[in-house]
Amino acid sequence: MQKMPIELKGSNFTFLVLYLNTNNVDLISKSLYKKIQEYPQFFKNVPVIVNVSNLLNQVNWKKIQEIIIEYGFYIVGVSGCKDNYFKKIIVESGLPVLLESNTTNTNKDLRSFYHTSTLKKTKNEQRLRVKKIEKTHIINTPVRSGQKIYAKYSDLVVINNVSAGAELVADGNIHVYGSVRGRVLAGANGDITSKIFCTTLFAELISVSGQYWLSDQIPSHFIGKSAQIYLKNKFLTINSLS
C-alpha cells in the first residue's frame, strides 16, 4: 500500500524547560552564561520550552528571546503565559504559546526535572541491542579532563578516577571504580536495561538511554557516595550500593 505524502501523528517528545524567575535581562544573561560554562557541549543547540509563569509586568520579551537564542538554545515554545497581551507579544515574535498540559511534566524545582526521551522500542529492537553487546572495555588509567571514551556495543569499566570535563559513553553498562566528576552516559544506543555503577559519585551529568540528570538534579544525599543509576518505569532512578 502506497504511503501518503505526509502524515500527522501523535508522538511523545519532551523538552528541557527553562523557568524564568526574574524580568532582569542582565541577571538572566549572567545566569545562562554561568550554566553554559558548566556544560558547554551539553547545552549547544538544545531545544527548550521557556516558562514565563513567574515573570511580572513590563517584560522585555524581545531582549530575553534574543539572549536565550544568542547562548545557543533553540526555543520551541513558551508556556505559563496567562496575560493575553503578553501572549500576543510572544506569538508576534514567531513562537507558539503552549498550554501547560502540552509541556514536560516537571516540578518547578529543577532538581526534580526528569528528561524523558522517546522510549517506545519494539521487543525485536531490544533483542538486537542485547545481542550486539561485545567484550567489556576496561580502562585502568585516570580519565583526564577533555578525554572522551566510547565503548561501542560494549560495557565500559574504569578502574580509576574520572576528572571533571571527561566523558564516558557506552552502549551497555558503565562501571567506575573510583571518583567520577565528568559525564557518564550508559545505553547510548538506546538500551533501556543499561545501568551506571560508581563508587564515588560527583558526576557533572549522568544519563541512561537518553534520560539524564545534571549535577544539581542528583539527590544531594548520593553525592560522594557509591550508587547505581538505572531506568525504572521510564524514569531515572538512583540507589545506594552500600
Swiss-Prot record:
Disulphide connectivity of cysteines: none
Organism from which the protein derives: Buchnera aphidicola subsp. Schizaphis graminum (strain Sg)
SUPFAM superfamilies recorded: Cell-division inhibitor MinC, C-terminal domain
Subunit architecture: Interacts with MinD and FtsZ.
Family classification: Belongs to the MinC family.
Domain of life: Bacteria
Entry protein name: Probable septum site-determining protein MinC
Function: Cell division inhibitor that blocks the formation of polar Z ring septums. Rapidly oscillates between the poles of the cell to destabilize FtsZ filaments that have formed before they mature into polar Z rings. Prevents FtsZ polymerization.
Keywords in alphabetical order: Cell cycle, Cell division, Septation
Lineage of the organism: Bacteria, Pseudomonadati, Pseudomonadota, Gammaproteobacteria, Enterobacterales
